[in-house]
């Protein structure tokens, strides 16, 4: 985030959101819904990214290539380090069959589709999910998918429907809520 645009109250929200996630993963029974903190992080990230893009669009300075480069520099080094380190360690700790499955996980991580991989193969709340070292990358995949597609959507709306941008954003919010409800009805994990 740019220093001049720093919003300390958002850091406060981040701190509040991370606590239930930590307590949930630490196994505290009272925080079984701690994963809601991840949703809060998604909302904060969406808000910040939308603001950054819209400010640059208004000034006619937005370059999608620069946006992607900034995101890649921020996320890819740590992601590749964790994925590669995990693959190397897996050679010493896993059976050949487990390594094959784990390699598929690693590929899904670097392609930013691990959320779909885990959804289709293990499920986040499955007891065996605790044995998946890269399970936590599902949320990063969701975030990266947002970073890849949402700017393109915003540019399209800005270019062709600038006066109706707020209506489109409200439509996205409503569509998102409908998808959440449908996901709950289908017991997606």
What are these regions (language model features)?
Residues 1-189:
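Membrane-interface helix/loop caps of multi-pass membrane proteins
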């Amino acid at each position: 985030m740019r220093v001049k645009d720093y919003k300390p109250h958002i850091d406060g929200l981040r701190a509040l959101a991370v606590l239930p996630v930590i307590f949930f993963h630490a196994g505290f029974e009272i925080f079984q819904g701690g994963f809601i903190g991840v949703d809060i992080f998604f909302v904060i990230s969406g808000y910040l990214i939308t603001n950054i893009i819209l400010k640059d669009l208004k000034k006619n300075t937005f370059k999608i290539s620069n946006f992607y480069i900034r995101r890649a520099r921020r996320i890819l080094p740590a992601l590749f380090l964790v994925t590669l380190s995990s693959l190397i360690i897996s050679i010493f700790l896993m059976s050949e069959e487990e390594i094959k499955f784990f390699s598929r996980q690693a590929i899904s991580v670097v392609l930013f589709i691990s959320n779909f991989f885990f959804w289709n193969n293990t499920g986040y709340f499955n007891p065996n999910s605790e044995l998946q070292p890269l399970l936590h990358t599902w949320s990063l995949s969701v975030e990266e998918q947002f970073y890849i597609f949402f700017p393109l959507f915003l540019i399209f709306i800005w270019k062709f429907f600038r006066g109706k941008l707020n209506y489109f954003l409200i439509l996205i919010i409503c569509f998102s809520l409908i998808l959440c409800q449908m996901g709950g009805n289908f017991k997606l994990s």
